[in-house]
């Protein structure tokens, strides 16, 4: 029989090479994982910037900050803070454009009453009134005048415990910090001037250069102090001209030749980037009356956009995916009209978001051999929207709320798979923190849960946006006209969602092209792995590796997991019987096939309770049928035959997508199944949907359904797939009339009798088989 392929996969799917298992761990998508938070918890790759570990006191260590630089007069770059670190009171810095801006920053020690002090400002002796009533904090005071002949006016003050102040040219204005540490912030309006780009700074103390983005960096220095300089004894300031050596900090967007040989050159690319991304999701509704949802989950989302960088229009492409999701569920009850969500995904503080970024600039043309990869990005908050679950009757439950903030946590190389091309790209990893508000589902007990649910993660936004910059050094050919190929060795994730989606659509469309007479013949063949996959191009060359991949994927299927659980249950049942051999209960007679020992209470059990019990039993009858095969045809024979036919007809099937397709087919083909057991003239039939019938073969007259007898028969008698179910049999008998022998043959799913009815163009039998074929969908 064709179902041999499933038994063969179940038998062989537990043998796999260790190297294959290790390789799969790094590439397979994980939907329900336990996270151990850490700086690089989610990748098997080393961090980009290695720490220095323990450092001897005599070792010189380059500080994290850009600086310190010696006092000098210079013109600072726009959008960069000049962070002043004076050691003593007095004039800290002089800033002017020699037109309408003369600004000086004065530092006053703590506990100074109001008094006049003499300072030398721009080469002139000037008396200024200063005061600092704080007992512990130092005070930075801004004095400004608008022309050379004006007097200085006190404009701004900063009370500081860290003795740090900063100035920056940005947006046509000059900004300094104001307020009181640890809550100091940049001025809201700044100092207006007609020619702010020409402002130069004469620093009278050591200073650092800090970029404006991310905004929190300089603010944290002002309020919390400079970061520790590790174990160095002395920090020696250098001339500002030494800053030219650190080439990646000279400008935001530039290409620098680091080294060059006859065949290769090293190019350093510095870029500021705007990352736009969005989440994708899928909401799957269960069958039935319309009150139940089976899945709400995240999916990878591609997004293409353009933005301007230094006057140049950039085309960018991002792919957003999540890892470490948390599975939630809601069950409103066991009735068919009770609201149920079997599984919905939520990302929280133990989750990660990956954003793969590519643009059409020179930096991404030859991104194969890369070193010194670093990035600096802002954070962003993602807030969830509302989703209304449309029920057939009654008020609609609404899931709303939820928010998380994304914080940069690392960068690696990756490859994006778009609809047309594979792109070498950068993967930015973000750790998550939960934010207000929590999410809830109205008209349920679900309330005040934190995280971002997958139901509406974009909240009507077209995209989320993150600004930042990156720097890398790439080894490329010396001639810019050459391009190196994409290297799969640097691929972090290969997203097959698009290929699988197209293949599923093709498979579902092929259902109408299957000839039923040929299908019955194919279902009778003993299909093994080689004959099943023989229609795929290149199978002979890669048969071993492909079969291994199929078995590894099948090992994690629901069918394989059910076999494992059943094996454990049978073992438990056997040990229980050996301990209590004198007791015969429903639990021991039905054993692990039924699990109804606690469900069958008495003969007055309500109909809905019987439905629940029979549905529970029926879920395991597929395994019972596979374990004890009869001569009749079963649902898995039809499922495997349809799978074989579609594989042969498919134009998109490939070895890399085959494992997913075979596994999905074993789980999703023919979801509505019914099984029967026979006791002389009586037949008991139950379906996975909870429907059950008991009837006599002679008259097709229904009789009361005895759950206990049904459970006993399942243990002692063969289980038969109800290919032609009770309703179809009764309809066939009422309209055409069938003999008792024909009825028995159809009840046993005899393939020869089925073929005869199909060849005779019997519309009732053909309609039933067509219905089963149409249920073979992915």
Swiss-Prot record:
Q: Give positions of region: Spike body and stalk (antigen domain).
A: 250-481
One GO BP: virion attachment to host cell
Q: Where is this region: Spike head?
A: 65-226
> What are the start and end residues of every segment in region (Spike foot)?
512-778
Q: Keyword annotations for this protein?
A: Capsid protein, Coiled coil, Disulfide bond, Hemagglutinin, Host cell membrane, Host cytoplasm, Host cytoskeleton, Host endoplasmic reticulum, Host membrane, Host-virus interaction, Membrane, Outer capsid protein, Viral attachment to host cell, Viral penetration into host cytoplasm, Viral penetration via permeabilization of host membrane, Virion, Virus entry into host cell
Q: What are the cysteine partners in each disulfide bond?
A: 205-218, 320-382
* InterPro entries to which the protein is assigned, alphabetical: ConA-like_dom_sf, Rota_A_VP4, Rota_VP4_MID, Rota_VP4_MID_sf, VP4_concanavalin-like, VP4_helical
Q: Where is this motif: KID motif?
A: 646-648
Enumerate the residue ranges of region (Hydrophobic): 391-411
- Coiled coil (UniProt feature): 486-513
Q: Which Pfam families does the UniProt entry name for this protein? A: Rota_VP4_MID, VP4_haemagglut, VP4_helical
Q: Where is this motif: YGL motif?
A: 450-452
- Additional comment: This strain probably does not use sialic acid to attach to the host cell.
Q: What is this protein called?
A: Outer capsid protein VP4
The species is Rotavirus A (isolate RVA/Pig/Venezuela/A46/1985/G5P13[13])
């Amino acid at each position: 029989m064709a179902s041999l392929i499933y038994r063969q996969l179940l038998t062989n799917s537990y043998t796999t090479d260790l190297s294959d298992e290790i390789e799969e761990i790094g590439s397979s998508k994980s939907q329900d994982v336990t996270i151990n938070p850490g700086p690089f918890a989610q990748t098997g790759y080393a961090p980009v910037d290695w720490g220095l570990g323990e450092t001897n006191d005599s070792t010189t260590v380059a500080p994290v900050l850009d600086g310190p630089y010696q006092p000098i007069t210079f013109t600072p770059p726009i959008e960069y803070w000049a962070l002043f670190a004076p050691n003593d009171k007095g004039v800290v810095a002089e800033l002017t454009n020699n037109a309408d801006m003369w600004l000086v920053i004065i530092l006053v020690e703590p506990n100074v009453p109001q008094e006049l002090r003499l300072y030398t400002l721009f080469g002139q002796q000037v008396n200024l009134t200063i005061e600092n009533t704080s007992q512990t904090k130092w005070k930075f005071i801004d004095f400004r005048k608008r022309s050379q002949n004006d007097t200085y006016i006190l404009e701004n003050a900063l009370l500081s415990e860290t003795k740090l102040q900063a100035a920056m040219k940005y947006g046509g204005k000059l900004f300094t910090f104001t307020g009181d540490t640890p809550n100091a912030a940049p001025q809201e309006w700044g100092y207006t001037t007609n020619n702010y780009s020409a402002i130069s700074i004469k620093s009278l103390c050591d200073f650092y250069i800090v970029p404006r983005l991310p905004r929190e960096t300089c603010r944290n220095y002002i309020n919390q102090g400079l970061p520790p300089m590790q174990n160095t004894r002395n920090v020696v300031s250098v001339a500002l001209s030494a800053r030219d050596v650190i080439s990646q900090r000279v400008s935001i967007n530039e290409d620098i030749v680091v080294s060059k040989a006859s065949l290769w050159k090293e190019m350093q690319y510095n870029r500021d980037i705007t990352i736009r991304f969005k989440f994708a999701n899928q909401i799957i509704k269960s069958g039935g009356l319309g009150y139940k949802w089976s899945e709400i989950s995240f999916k990878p989302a591609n997004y293409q956009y353009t933005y301007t960088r230094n006057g140049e229009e950039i085309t960018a492409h991002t792919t957003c995916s999540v890892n470490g999701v948390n599975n939630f569920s809601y069950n409103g009850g066991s009735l068919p009209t009770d609201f149920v969500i079997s599984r919905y995904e939520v990302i929280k503080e133990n989750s990660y978001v990956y954003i793969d970024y590519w643009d059409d600039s020179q930096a991404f043309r030859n991104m194969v051999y890369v070193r010194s990869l670093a990035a600096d990005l802002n954070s962003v908050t993602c807030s969830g929207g509302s989703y209304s679950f449309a029920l057939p009757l009654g008020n609609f439950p609404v899931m709303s709320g939820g928010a998380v903030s994304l914080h940069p946590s690392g960068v690696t190389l990756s490859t994006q798979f778009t609809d047309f091309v594979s792109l070498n790209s950068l993967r930015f990893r973000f750790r998550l923190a939960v934010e207000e508000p929590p999410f809830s589902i109205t008209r349920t007990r679900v309330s005040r849960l934190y995280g971002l649910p997958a139901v509406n993660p974009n909240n009507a936004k077209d995209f989320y946006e993150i600004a930042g910059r990156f720097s890398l050094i790439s080894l490329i050919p010396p001639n810019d006209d050459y391009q190196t190929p994409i290297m799969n060795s640097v691929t972090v994730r290969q997203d097959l969602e698009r290929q699988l989606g197209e293949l599923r659509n093709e498979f579902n469309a092929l259902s109408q092209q299957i000839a039923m007479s040929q299908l019955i013949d194919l279902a009778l063949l003993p299909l093994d792995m080689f004959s099943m996959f023989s229609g795929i191009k290149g199978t002979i060359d890669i048969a071993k590796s492909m079969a291994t991949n199929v078995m590894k994927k099948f090992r994690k299927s629901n069918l394989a997991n059910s076999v494992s659980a059943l094996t454990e249950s049978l073992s438990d049942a056997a040990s229980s019987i050996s301990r209590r051999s004198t007791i015969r209960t429903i639990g021991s007679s039905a054993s692990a096939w039924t699990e109804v020992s606690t469900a069958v209470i008495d003969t007055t059990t309500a109909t809905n309770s019987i439905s629940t019990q029979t549905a529970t039993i029926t879920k395991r009858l597929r395994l019972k049928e596979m374990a004890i095969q009869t001569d009749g045809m079963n649902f898995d024979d039809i499922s495997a035959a349809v799978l074989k036919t579609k594989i042969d007809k498919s134009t998109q099937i490939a070895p890399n997508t085959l494992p997913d397709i075979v596994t999905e087919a074993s789980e999703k083909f023919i979801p509505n199944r019914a099984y029967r057991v026979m006791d002389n003239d009586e037949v008991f039939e139950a379906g996975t949907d909870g429907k059950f019938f008991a009837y006599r073969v002679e008259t097709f007259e229904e009789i009361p359904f005895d759950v206990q007898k049904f459970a006993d028969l399942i243990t002692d008698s063969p289980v038969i797939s109800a290919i032609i179910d009770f309703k179809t049999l009764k309809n066939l008998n009422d309209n055409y009339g069938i003999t008792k022998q024909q009825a028995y043959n159809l009840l046993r799913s005899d393939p020869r009798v089925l073929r005869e009815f199909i060849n005779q163009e019997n519309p009732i039998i053909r309609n039933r088989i067509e219905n089963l074929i149409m249920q073979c969908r992915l």
